[in-house]
Amino acid sequence: MNDNVHFILLAVFLCALCILGTRFLKNYKFKQLLNCIKNQDVSRFSQIANSRLTKLLFPPYNIEYLKLNAFLLEGDEQEIDHQFTKMLDFNLGKTQRCDLLLKAYDYYLSKRNKKQCKSILKDIKSLEEKELYQDALKCYLIIFEKCTKYVDEMESQLHSMDSKEKSYLEYLLSIQYENLGDSNKSNFYKEQSLIHSS
């Protein structure tokens, strides 16, 4: 064989080695990051996430998304707020933006932060996903505006839903019945929601 063939074979071998090595490193680092999140080892997570190698292997949004999940597990409200603000400024595709907005909306709903929810609701509306916006608006109205007009609609939907969806609807029903002053039905749906969430 001549030298050109040897050179080409060597180049192909080195390229394959680089590709496989990069994949291995990516998987290894990703598993390390996930283990830190599972074990709530935020300091180790930060150390790995902020390393040069991790920054070379992963797009910035992916690293920031993992950081957000770590802060959510830790319950550090200040860092969570900062992370959502930072990430919502990223130039994201529609799917990623939608996912992030819903995650932020659910978080701020759970914290009963009306101001943040109202702001995020406007962003959700700008996505032009009518059904998604209507669902988010419904939650906002029930939780913050003490709306009770969805009781019949939600109760009729319960029969056709899986456990996770049932749990969420039952939670919203418990709030509506609480708003109506019916503590028996509110407690019933609260208990049902807990049963279907596990």
Annotated model-derived regions:
Residues 1-32:
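N-terminal signal-anchor transmembrane alpha helix of single-pass membrane proteins
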Residues 21-31, 56-65, 93-102, 128-138, ...:
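Generic helix N-cap/helix-start motif at coil->alpha-helix transitions
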Residues 22-96, 120:
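N-terminal topogenic membrane-targeting module
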Residues 36, 71, 108, 142-145, ...:
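Residue at a conserved register position within TPR or TPR-like alpha-solenoid repeats
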Residues 43-52, 76-89, 113-128, 149-162, ...:
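Alpha-helical repeat scaffolds
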Residues 89-115:
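Alpha-helical transmembrane segments and their immediate juxtamembrane interface regions
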Residues 133-159, 164-178:
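Soluble C-terminal extramembrane regulatory/interaction domains of multi-pass membrane proteins
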Residues 170-198:
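Alpha-helical oligomerization segments
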